Amino acid sequence: MRRHTHHKHSSRKGYRRLLDRLAAHESVHRVATGRVKPRMGSGRPIAPISKVRRVESGLSITINTEGAVIDAYVVTDKPEEVAAWMRAEGLAR
């Protein structure tokens, strides 16, 4: 009998494309996803990336989708450059 994998949260193509776009930036070494939490409330996301925080390895970002909030980490040695690029591209506020 075929076994089905239980997915706690669906992985949407929209935020996968966003992560691929971040990973394609020349200053980004790696992009890793963290926790996926259900989105509370009925409000729509203002920007795909709502929070950009500096951490030791680069940047910690929060991605808003229709049904979930995803924490991700952008490993880079030029976090200011990557954060400015995200704002210029309209990905972050």
Model feature map: region roles:
Residues 1-93:
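Short, Lys/Arg-rich flexible segments
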